[in-house]
């Protein structure tokens, strides 16, 4: 029973083991899942077992062992092998023995698989032990191999280190060798370069020559940078010799090419035109003087670039470049100097006597020559502007040498001014400013020539001012005032009258009507132009010295520098004022003082108006020495003779040096203010003479009465005779009311008779209503004031009411009405002339019209009008700009001027 239970329990255990083994490899939820690598190892072991031989027992996996299979095998085997003995069982003992044998056999058969598995395990154990022994042996051999590897590695590392050291040493030695070879290269090229430079086949324009120059420069620079090397000085000399040979080759080549071009230009072949014939044709001249050189420029340019690229870093190349340029310019000078000289001589012959055309043509020719020469020069070289400028200045000096003898003998200011304009405007401002680099030399010579012309112009202007202004002797026609103005005014009036209209002879002729319309329009246009200026303002009616002064200043203004013009204008205006004053004196002596003064006022106004457009300051600073203190210091020195050598602070000589120093004084002379001062003086004199002419008897009476009253007035106002002093004038026979009445009547008669003449003269000379009103206002006020003084004098000196009635002394209002009525009568008397003047005058100032309106309103007032100052009158007098010629248009008038020849040269 125990065996059966034991067997059952074993079977049960086997069943559990089988179930667990099945769960280990279950596809759904395995207890011990094998990885892919483990399965591969298992397959490898299986294959090894299969390959080991048929004697080896087949492996039995736990999954193949089970109780059902074991029992089935045991049953089948027990059915076959376990049999009863043939004799049978005789007794119980035999049965028990048999049963024991059967049980042992069953038990043995039941454990057969386990025994086989145990054998396999033992076999595997033996194999593993054997494998472990092999692994141990392999590990021993591997350890030995590692030891040997470490030994070899140490040896190899040492060998590698030694090899690297040797390689580094080899590289260092190679670098040292290369460095030595590189440095020796700069010393070993001397012979090779000498051989190349001495080769007869070497061409300067070839690439081999360029390489030679590069090597020479490289070696020279290296040796100069390392002067401490052995034999550096000797090799420097050798390379310098090579450079000298190369420079000689370049110099010979370039000079040969340039000389050939020069020879071909100066001595052309028979089929080429000669120089004299070529100068007459510009294209032929250009081909002759520039064709050969332009052909040679291509050969020289490449070689010149070799030198120019090195000239900035080497003085030898710079000197060689300068020599080549000097040779080129010398050859060009030998070609162009005679040609330029001949051309200028031809121009001089062609424009003989016409200095302006000669200057313009000669300068234009030199401008083209300078531009062509500059263009040709830069076809050969890229640098060298200073040498080119010197060469071009030499060519332009021919122009200067040709023109200067003419300039220093020109006497006419017009010619000198025109030459100045040509040089300054046409040449310097137009041509030179457009191309300043090419025309630098021409600008220098033109500026020198301009300075000579300006110097001559200033000199001739001084002589002109002295001869034609200061020493001007006017003729009777120059002083025929106011006859000249009256004649011109009559001509203006005759032109003002419109011609009677007439019908055309043929109404059907369109040509005749059109031509008549055109003719009428042209006549109207001419008449309009002629009536723009009044007779007194016409340029031809100016006094010759005024006209000449303004013409001279207008020419000098555009020709000379501003400081020079200021000095000349100061002198010219001063002489012009003196000349006008002298002419006014002669007119006053021949005609009346009024004519002379109006003549001077008009021309001073013209002079002031014409110098206004000049944008210069007419102020000139004059410096002088004041020696007034020198005399005082000298007297002090003589009085202190004993203190001449005194060692103290009272040394007489020291005081003389300190106190006797001349003082420098500066005086500012303003020509504009000088004109204003002269105008003020003349206006004052004219106002005085006009008042004297209109109310002369009244002024004489007032002066005589004032003198009498001044003599009879006591020294002290408290004197008892002071009350009788007021009757002294009344008791004088010449101051009786009847005499005063006759004086007043005579004065009124003079006003009525001469006021029209006075205003007529003002209108004739001044030709400007505003100016006439401004000048007439103080005359009017002085006349009114004279009558007011007379009335005050009669009132305060014992004249009774009956005496006042007898004298018929008018009041200020009555005098104003009298002057206004006389002015109206005068205006009616000269209505035609005033209308002509108003139509001839083109414009008037707003300020002047305002003043005129004030004067008209003033005439209706009975109050005494304050007398305006003469300075205000002179400041208010203005000439309408449209009535006078501007300085720019003065030269356009055809004015005949007489110029005397000066012998000061």
Swiss-Prot record:
**What is the protein's name according to its record?**
Conserved oligomeric Golgi complex subunit 3
Instruction: State the residue spans of region: Disordered.
Output: 49-78, 884-905
Major place of localization? Golgi
Which source organism does the UniProt entry give?
Answer: Drosophila melanogaster
Polar residues: compositionally biased ranges:
64-78
Per UniProt, what is the membrane topology? Peripheral membrane protein
Residues found modified as Phosphoserine:
841, 845, 856, 859, 862
Q: Which Pfam families match?
A: COG3_C, COG3_N
């Amino acid at each position: 029973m125990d065996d059966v239970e034991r067997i059952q329990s074993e079977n049960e255990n086997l069943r559990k083991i089988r179930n667990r083994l099945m769960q280990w490899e279950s596809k759904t939820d395995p207890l011990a899942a094998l990885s892919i690598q483990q399965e591969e190892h298992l397959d490898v072991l299986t294959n090894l077992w299969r390959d080991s031989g048929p004697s080896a027992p087949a492996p039995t996996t736990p999954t193949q062992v089970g109780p059902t299979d074991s029992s089935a095998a045991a049953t089948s085997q027990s059915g076959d092998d376990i049999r009863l003995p043939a004799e049978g069982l005789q007794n119980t003992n035999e049965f028990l023995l048999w049963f024991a044998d059967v049980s042992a056999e069953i038990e043995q058969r039941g454990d057969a698989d386990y025994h086989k598995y145990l054998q396999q395990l033992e076999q595997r154990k033996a194999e593993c032990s054997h494998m472990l022994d092999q692994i141990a042996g392999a590990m021993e051999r591997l350890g030995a191999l590692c030891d040997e590897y470490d030994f070899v590695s140490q040896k190899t590392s040492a060998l590698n280190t030694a090899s690297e050291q040797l390689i580094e040493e080899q590289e260092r030695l190679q670098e040292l060798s290369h460095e030595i070879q590189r440095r020796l290269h700069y010393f070993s090229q001397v012979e090779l370069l000498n051989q190349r430079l001495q080769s007869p086949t070497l061409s300067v324009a070839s690439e081999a020559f360029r390489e030679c120059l590069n090597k020479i420069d490289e070696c020279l620079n290296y040796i100069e940078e390392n002067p401490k090397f052995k034999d550096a000085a000797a090799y420097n000399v050798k390379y310098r010799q090579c450079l000298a040979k190369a420079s000689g080759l370049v110099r010979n080549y370039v000079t040969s090419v340039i000389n050939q071009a020069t020879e071909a230009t100066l001595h052309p072949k028979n089929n080429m035109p000669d120089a004299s014939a070529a100068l007459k044709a510009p294209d032929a001249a250009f081909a002759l003087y520039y064709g050969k050189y332009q052909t040679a420029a291509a050969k020289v340019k490449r070689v010149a670039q070799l030198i120019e690229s090195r000239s900035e870093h080497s003085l030898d190349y710079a000197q060689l470049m300068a020599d080549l340029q000097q040779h080129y310019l010398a050859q060009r000078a030998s070609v162009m100097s005679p040609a330029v000289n001949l051309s200028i001589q031809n121009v001089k012959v062609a424009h003989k006597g016409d200095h302006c055309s000669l200057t313009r043509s000669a300068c234009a020719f030199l401008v083209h020559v300078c531009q062509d020469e500059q263009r040709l020069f830069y076809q050969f070289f890229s640098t060298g502007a200073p040498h080119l400028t010197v060469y071009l200045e030499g060519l332009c000096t021919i122009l200067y040498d040709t023109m200067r003898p003419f300039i220093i003998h020109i006497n006419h200011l017009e010619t000198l001014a025109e030459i100045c304009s040509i040089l300054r405007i046409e040449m310097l401002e137009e041509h030179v400013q457009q191309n300043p680099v090419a025309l630098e030399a021409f600008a220098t010579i033109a500026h020198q020539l301009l300075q000579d012309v300006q110097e001559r112009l200033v000199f001739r202007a001084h002589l002109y001012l002295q001869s034609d202004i200061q020493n001007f002797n006017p003729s009777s026609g120059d002083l025929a005032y106011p006859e000249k103005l009256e004649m011109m005014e009559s001509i203006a009036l005759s032109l003002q009258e419109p011609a009677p209209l007439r019908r055309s002879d043929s109404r059907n002729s369109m040509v005749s009507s059109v031509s008549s319309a055109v003719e009428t329009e042209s006549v109207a246009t001419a008449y309009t132009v002629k009536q723009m200026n009044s007779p007194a303002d016409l340029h031809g009616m100016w006094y010759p010295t005024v006209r000449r002064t303004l013409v001279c200043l207008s020419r000098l203004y555009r020709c000379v520098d501003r400081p020079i013009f200021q000095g000349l204008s100061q002198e010219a205006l001063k002489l012009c004022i003196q000349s006008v004053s002298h002419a006014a004196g002669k007119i006053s002596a021949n005609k009346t003082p009024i004519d002379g003064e109006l003549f001077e006022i008009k021309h001073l106004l013209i002079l002031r108006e014409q110098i206004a457009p000049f944008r210069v300051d007419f102020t000139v600073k004059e410096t002088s020495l004041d020696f007034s203190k020198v005399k005082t210091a000298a007297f002090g020195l003589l009085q202190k003779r004993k203190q001449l050598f005194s060692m103290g602070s009272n040394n007489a000589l020291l005081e003389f040096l300190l106190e006797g120093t001349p003082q420098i004084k500066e005086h500012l002379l303003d020509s504009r203010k000088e004109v204003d001062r002269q105008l003020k003086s003349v206006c004052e004199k004219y106002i005085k003479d006009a008042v004297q002419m209109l109310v002369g008897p009244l002024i004489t009476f007032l002066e005589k009465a004032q003198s009498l009253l001044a003599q009879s007035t006591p020294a002290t106002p408290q004197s008892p005779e002071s009350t009788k002093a007021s009757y002294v004038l009344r008791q004088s026979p010449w101051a009786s009311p009847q005499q005063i009445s006759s004086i007043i009547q005579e004065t009124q008669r003079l006003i009525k008779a001469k006021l029209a003449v006075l205003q007529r003269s003002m209108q004739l000379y001044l030709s400007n209503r505003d100016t006439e009103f401004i000048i007439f206002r103080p005359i009017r006020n002085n006349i009114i004031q004279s009558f007011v003084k007379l009335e005050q004098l009669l009132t305060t000196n014992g004249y009774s009411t009956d005496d006042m009635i007898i004298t018929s002394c008018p009041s200020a209002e009555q005098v104003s009405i009298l002057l206004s009525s006389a002015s109206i009568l005068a205006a009616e008397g000269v209505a035609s002339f005033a209308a002509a003047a108003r139509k001839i005058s083109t414009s008037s100032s707003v300020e002047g019209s305002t003043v005129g309106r004030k004067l008209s309103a003033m005439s209706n007032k009975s109050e005494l009008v304050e007398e305006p100052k003469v300075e205000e009158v002179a400041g208010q007098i203005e000439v309408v700009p449209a009535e006078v010629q501007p300085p720019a248009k003065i030269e356009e008038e055809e004015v005949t001027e007489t110029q005397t020849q000066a012998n000061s040269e």
